[in-house]
Amino acid sequence: MNISYNWLKEYVNFDLTPDETAAALTSIGLETGGVEEVQTIKGGLEGLVIGEVLTCEEHPNSDHLHITTVNLGDGEPVQIVCGAPNVAAGQKVVVATLGTKLYDGDECFTIKKSKIRGVESTGMICAEDEIGIGTDHAGIIVLPAEAVPGTLAKDYYNIKSDYVLEVDITPNRADACSHYGVARDLYAYLIQNGKQATLQRPSVDGFKVENHDLDIEVVVENSEACPHYAGVTVKGVTVKESPEWLQNKLRLIGVRPINNVVDITNYIVHAFGQPLHCFDAGKIKGNEVIVKTLPEGTPFVTLDEVERKLSERDLMICNKEEAMCIAGVFGGLDSGSTEATTDVFIESAYFHPTWVRKTARRHGLNTDASFRFERGIDPNGVIYCLKLAALMVKELAGGTISSEIKDVCVAVPQDFMVELSYEKVNSLIGKVIPVETIKSIVTSLEMKIMNETVDGLTLAVPPYRVDVQRDCDVIEDILRIYGYNNVEIPTTLNSSLTTKGEHDKSNKLQNLVAEQLVGCGFNEILNNSLTRAAYYDGLENYSSNHLVMLLNPLSADLNCMRQTLLFGGLESIAHNANRKNADLKFFEFGNCYYFDADKKNPEKVLATYSEDYHLGLWVTGKKVANSWAHPDENSSVYELKAYVENILKRLGLDLHNLVVGNLTDDIFATALSVHTKGGKRLASFGVVTKKLLKAFDIDNEVYYADLNWKELMKAIRSVKISYKEISKFPAVKRDLALLLDKNVQFAEIEKIAYDTEKKLLKEVELFDVYEGKNIEAGKKSYAVSFLLQDETQTLNDKMIDKIMSKLVKNLEDKLNAKLR
């Protein structure tokens, strides 16, 4: 945000240089990126002088050029070739001398001696647009006869210079989005540093209603979105160019002057942070302003001549017949004041930040008004700024104040009450701050001391400080004004020590699994814990009712905490796929957050919130890069399943003691889940639905696995690793071809096998699945291998046949299996 050095001095008196002011602001948290000397006209008209055309003759080699001699007031006249049709002898003109830099937007060029059609030219006679004082290019500037040759153009045009401070306002500092807001903080800095300073703003005591010739009523139908709305009329105004001082003020901070009425509103928003709007009162049909919402899809044409479809959640400023303005965001095409306007209705309001922010995002608009409203303006400044605007309109545009202030306020803004402990101040800052210093700082920041004890203060924080509502916020303010550099680095460091525990074990295992995944070709990703609530619309397993929503999000794309890692990974896949990198394996460790309204407890606010640590895996695209050694093969859900099983094995879990079953989940087209026998879900994995992939513009199949790291850590607490000697006796393998119903899973066969022979059965492997020719409908064939081994003896055929017969019988009885 651009802050004018001279403008700042109108509100607080100080003797710091521009660079010292920038350093002071940076030290108190208003980081100032740079200081730039500026003029009301770019370049300050340096090198331009007033000249008198002595002679003007036609160019011998051109039908439109003229050869002139010009008196610049300091020596011999100069010869200048000029192409303007209106140049003539005897004129007083503006001349750019050799070496002068002229600007065209961000580009500039230097005036040099040159030959034009064979005739030497040592300068340039200028038009309005060439030096930045206007837009006319029809001919050169012709000055009044009393203009004196040799006068510097910057003196003739009374060019003003200033210094602009580029202040980077953080999102929480809505109160500093104006010159007066910055002046408040600078005032506190000056007081803390022993300077004599006063903070002042223009008086509005002169505001007086002169007649009631133009009463316009105000009706607020949606007080949630608009807690405070006020307006007043000024009758008999003349809309014209603003006086030079006002134009200069705006130009110096990069704002283009428009007319006196609009410039007044722009002046006030940059001076005090209160957005205003001046309606042409003659266009307010029915002499009534109504603040309300309109039906979904209502068309509305804004000032930029774009027709927008309104949402039923867009707050609108309307008259009796039609909408005039998107509240707090953008005016309508016919809502503003023009040269034909004679009466104005000035609006000043406090719109709810959330409503303004969502409307601005919906329509892709970012205006000076929405920038401030969505962060939270000073609710106590509504009437002050309205009165100031009315007085300025009366002064600069004429007219009379022709109505009482129509003030609709449903909620009087209250101060934030904060209990401040001296002990906590000193503890958080790391230094004992004198009590008198603390009191001086908080009062210089316009906080009122409501009560004082030996232990601390009760403070009333003004409502414009939306970022200061807790004691730690006040302490932060105390520290920044006291000065970070005034807190010495301690010579000793105190720290509490703890023995290694579960957290350290979890970290080691996390690193172990991460190394395993990297070895399998995965890349680790790290996504924002904040995500878009719209991703959860229509989901049952991850209902939007259970989202942890942000009260004051900066963006609709980051307005809630994630319930699942899935969507962050899909964003990463989409980002890579759009850059021709579609063969991907990702993993991410991160927290997921959950809100449960049923657990609401006034005494335990956090009882409704929970968070769990998860591991997410994403696989998509080709299994391996194409080469002569590897055929073109896509990744599959079975590949992902193998990765999940390997992780569980690496953590020491016995897969035979886990329960695998089908999972119905609206993020998966098909999926399985892995549970402990006690019913705790350890993992789920499957094929992501086409609907979700389409929302991210992903064409390839994506396979996703979610592992609950917290439950995994609980499960491995009971895992005991035992070592045994490698058997000296050979293992025996037997294969069976089983005909089963199509819906029977291999996991069921595996479970029955291990339940049948607990001692000698070591492995069960599926090596072929067949459906089709010679297999009846609704059936499939599993080819399964069984590995048997005894650590004490060599197995003979009789022992093996007995085990296999028992196994076949159990499969026939429980799964209706038949041998092929």
From Swiss-Prot:
SMART domains: B3_4, B5, FDX-ACB. PROSITE patterns: B5, FDX_ACB, TRBD. Its EC number is 6.1.1.20. Mg(2+) binds at residues 467, 473, 476-477. One of its GO terms (biological process) is phenylalanyl-tRNA aminoacylation. One of its GO terms (cellular component) is phenylalanine-tRNA ligase complex. Keywords: Aminoacyl-tRNA synthetase, ATP-binding, Cytoplasm, Ligase, Magnesium, Metal-binding, Nucleotide-binding, Protein biosynthesis, RNA-binding, tRNA-binding. Residues 727-820 form the FDX-ACB domain. The keyword ATP-binding applies. CDD domains: PheRS_beta_core, tRNA_bind_bactPheRS. It is found in: Cytoplasm. Its cofactor is Mg(2+). Gene3D superfamilies: 3.30.56.10, Bira Bifunctional Protein, Domain 2 (3.30.930.10), Ferrodoxin-fold anticodon-binding domain (3.30.70.380), Nucleic acid-binding proteins (2.40.50.140), Phenylalanyl-trna Synthetase, Chain B, domain 3 (3.50.40.10). Residues 413-489 form the B5 domain. GO terms for molecular function: ATP binding; magnesium ion binding; phenylalanine-tRNA ligase activity; tRNA binding. InterPro entries: aa-tRNA-synth_II/BPL/LPL, B3/B4_tRNA-bd, DNA-bd_dom_put_sf, Fdx_antiC-bd, Fdx_antiC-bd_sf, NA-bd_OB-fold, Phe-tRNA-ligase_IIc_bsu, Phe-tRNA-ligase_IIc_bsu_bact. Belongs to the phenylalanyl-tRNA synthetase beta subunit family. Type 1 subfamily. Tetramer of two alpha and two beta subunits. PANTHER family: PHENYLALANINE--TRNA LIGASE BETA SUBUNIT (PTHR10947:SF0), PHENYLALANYL-TRNA SYNTHETASE BETA CHAIN AND LEUCINE-RICH REPEAT-CONTAINING PROTEIN 47 (PTHR10947). This is Phenylalanine--tRNA ligase beta subunit. It comes from Bacteroides thetaiotaomicron (strain ATCC 29148 / DSM 2079 / JCM 5827 / CCUG 10774 / NCTC 10582 / VPI-5482 / E50). The gene is pheT.
